[in-house]
């Protein structure tokens, strides 16, 4: 779990980068065998751009070299998790840059995944009840990491806060009833979560501000439905095992006796 508030260079607006970093750590861990082959074939690609370490460090101050990488190249301002994923892997989207030397960056895995391709295919804004459930079920079935943004999660208000979903529970109708999510700002929630990495939270479905219109997925608030946090954005990241296998052959997925 990556904390967006522990770094001293200013990152209070960079939850988008912290959420993307969480997803990228998952991605590189499960693609480690393919990445080793990639590095053997393309040891200096992309030329002139140094990739951050993928080692996840077990200390609060410097857990994620990937997140540090984003902090050192982007200004402390709002951004997009979806853009960050595609930019890091293939330069398929843009991110705000404070370092102009990276404006021609082609992506760290462009030799296999392609340059300027969308590894994360789309960002869903304002998902309906049915669309939210469709995306969660598909992502969990197809081994995809899930990024999301919810309004009102940090200090109230309507500003979206970016986080990641890693699991779900379903009710008797097959709808998501609880999510297991990681909040990169959960240092503010240590008492409530008792130090847990994943937070289990009930989902509700109702119109925005209970004002009519279609049902929207909300993270339930203990203060009542008027304080529930609507999920306003979703994106997913697949492992791209088909592209890896086309280049290097089929390898077993770590921790799974099946192959892709």
Per-segment meaning from a language model:
Residues 126-142, 147-260:
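Active-site signature of cysteine proteases
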Residues 8-127:
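Cysteine-nucleophile protease catalytic domains, especially the papain-like/related folds used
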Residues 1-6:
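Non-catalytic, low-structured ubiquitin/UBL-interacting segments
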């Amino acid at each position: 779990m990556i904390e967006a508030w522990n770094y001293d260079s200013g990152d209070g607006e960079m939850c988008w980068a912290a959420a993307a970093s969480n997803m990228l750590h998952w991605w590189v861990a499960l693609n480690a065998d393919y990445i080793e082959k990639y590095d053997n074939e393309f040891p200096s690609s992309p030329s002139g751009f140094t990739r951050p370490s993928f080692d996840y460090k077990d200390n609060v101050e410097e857990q994620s070299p990937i997140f540090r990488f984003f902090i050192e190249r982007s200004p402390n301002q709002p951004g997009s998790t979806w853009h960050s994923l595609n930019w890091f892997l293939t330069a398929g989207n843009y991110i705000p840059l404070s370092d102009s030397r990276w404006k021609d960056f082609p992506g760290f895995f462009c030799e296999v995944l392609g340059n300027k391709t969308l590894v994360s295919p789309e960002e869903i804004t304002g998902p309906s009840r049915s669309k939210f459930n469709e995306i969660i079920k598909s992502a969990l079935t197809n081994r995809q990491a899930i990024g999301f943004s919810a309004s009102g999660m940090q200090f109230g208000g309507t500003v979206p806060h970016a986080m990641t979903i890693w699991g779900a529970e379903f009710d008797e109708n097959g709808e998501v009833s609880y999510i297991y999510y990681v909040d990169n700002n959960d240092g503010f929630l240590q008492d409530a979560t008792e130090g847990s990495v994943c937070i289990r939270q009930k989902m509700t479905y109702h119109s925005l501000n209970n004002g009519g219109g279609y049902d929207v997925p909300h993270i339930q608030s203990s203060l009542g439905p008027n304080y529930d946090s609507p999920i306003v954005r979703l994106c997913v990241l697949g492992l791209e095992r088909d592209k890896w296998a086309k280049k290097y052959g089929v390898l077993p997925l770590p921790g799974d006796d099946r192959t892709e």
